[in-house]
Amino acid sequence: MTEMYPAYYEAFRCTAGACRHNCCIGWEIDIDGKSAERYAALPGAFGERVRAAVEPGEPPHFRLDAAGRCAMLRDDNLCELQRTLGEGALCNICRDHPRYRVFLAGRTEIGLGLCCEEAARLLLSRTEKVTLRGAVSKAPPRETVELLLFRQRLLDAAQDRRLTLGGRMRKILPLAGASLPRRTARAWAAFFASLEPLEPGWTETLAKLARPVDFTGFHAVSAAWETEYEQLLVYFLLRHLLADEGRALPARAAFAVLSTAMLYALGAAARTENGTVSFGERVELARLWSANVEYSEENMRAALDELT
């Protein structure tokens, strides 16, 4: 089995208690079978403490308090389980987050999800073109090679710096046999606002596109940040294009383009409202998009259906 990951992957470090959007708050964390067995066998008072924090079910999950905080999260925003027993005691999701995986025949690709603010900051701060690295054990089967070659054509277009961002996106769509319904950013914002929000403030963020937006002014200043949108476009292609083993390729390519275009539009809306939009604000927009769209199976399904 070959495992590949973006070159920046190894630079990721969790910011733990310093994180403003703690992944132990607001998320119902499922517990894998092996971890559940391990927690059930923990001895002593701490074992009782852990078991009291687990809600039985299929699968079981950690309880959330009235503020949406995991029952194992301390007041200093560090995990009591990890601090007491070490990282090896964490369940799979807690140990793995914000990593995602794309599984192909003979190949697994690993990346960092943008719902994590540190992963988003790391991605948007990169100016180098994205390359994949890892351990290649043997050549993948032909069907995987064909999918990878197809995706590489789209990645090459996404990173063709002779073209504007818009030119790259317009090139990707026909290469993928895809098209976007002709709608304004305001109309697309209304569509995404009709889906279930996962975080407070998301609907209000989308609503900014219902007001007049100075795209011309944003285009002039955002030229200096074009690599940020290139990184986003590449990220969405890597994460989603082959996520279903090559099914729904046109819709998934269109989703990558639409996601990048919407983040550009949301940046323009933020600048119109405030007169400026900082790097930190652009990171937060990427995180919000990821948390409210990518990390909801229902919302992803609705978006892909809309693009099919």
PLM feature segments, named:
Residues R151, L155-T308:
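Hydrophobic, aromatic-lined core segments that form the binding pocket/scaffold
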Residues G47-N77:
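Gly/Pro-rich turn-and-neighbor structural signature
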Residues M1-M4:
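Short, Gly/Pro- and small/polar-rich lid/capping loops
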Residues C14, T84, T144, L249-A253:
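Short, charged/polar micro-motifs that form catalytic or ligand-binding hotspots
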Residues A11-I29, D65-Y100, G113-A120:
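Local cysteine-cluster metal-coordination motifs and their immediate loop/turn environment
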Residues Y8-P59:
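Polybasic, low-complexity association/targeting segments
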Residues A11-A18, T127-L132, L232-Y235:
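Short, compositionally biased low-complexity segments
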Residues N77, L85-L163:
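Internal, well-ordered alpha/beta segment that forms a basic, Gly-enriched binding/recognition surface
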